[in-house]
């Protein structure tokens, strides 16, 4: 049986459209689910959630009073699901679904430090955080001056999470945290928030 070109073209258009629609629906469900998880852990940590925004590939939650953070925002960045080939290519290239926390503290430190998980894309930008590099457990500690003396328990707690980067610095935003989205999201975010105070004190 012969199939003319117009039929093939129509079938391709229908398939691509269906893929885009399905990808957008799946993406929106994912962001809705992650947003609910985030709001739950943020409120459990005593934060006041002020606003939320969502789309099929991102979500933004902002508020105040999160541990040491006076003001904060949490951005969820998902790899777009609308184009399955693009999604697979992004995964093969090492890109991940991420949760990114930024915030300000009342008393910023006089110098900065960043913890970057070894063996992840986070270490590619290590030099932007400082010139001094030291290894501490599963992380590289990058600072401008001599490395701060961090409590070993802080490093140990962070090591068991999906935290990729945690930075505390004098400039706004004072705190950065990048977390790989997964089953450890809640414990990772909680550990990062609790570590901020210890890191800031070590930098004083």
List PLM regions with ranges.
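N-terminal short leaders/motifs
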Residues: 7-18, 48-57, 129-130
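Exposed regions on extracellular, virion, or secretory-pathway luminal proteins
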Residues: 21, 42-43, 158-161
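N-terminal topogenic membrane-targeting module
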Residues: 24-95
């Amino acid at each position: 049986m012969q199939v003319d070109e117009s039929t093939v073209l129509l079938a391709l258009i229908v398939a691509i459209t269906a893929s885009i629609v399905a990808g957008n629906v799946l993406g929106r469900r994912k962001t809705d689910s992650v947003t609910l998880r985030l709001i739950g852990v943020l409120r459990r940590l005593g934060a006041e959630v002020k606003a939320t925004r969502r789309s099929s590939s991102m979500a933004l939650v902002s508020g105040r009073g999160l541990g040491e953070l006076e003001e904060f925002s949490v951005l969820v960045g998902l790899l777009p699901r609308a184009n399955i080939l693009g999604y697979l290519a992004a995964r093969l290239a090492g890109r991940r679904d991420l949760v990114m926390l930024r915030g300000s503290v009342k008393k910023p430190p006089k110098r900065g430090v960043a913890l970057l998980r070894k063996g992840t894309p986070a270490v590619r930008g290590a030099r932007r955080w400082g010139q001094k590099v030291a290894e501490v457990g599963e992380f590289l500690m990058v600072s401008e001056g001599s490395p701060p003396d961090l409590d070993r328990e802080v490093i140990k707690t962070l090591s068991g999470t999906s935290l990729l980067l945690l930075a505390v610095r004098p400039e706004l935003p004072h705190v950065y945290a990048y977390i790989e989205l997964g089953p450890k999201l809640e414990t990772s975010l909680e550990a990062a928030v609790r570590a901020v105070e210890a890191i800031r004190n070590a930098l004083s």
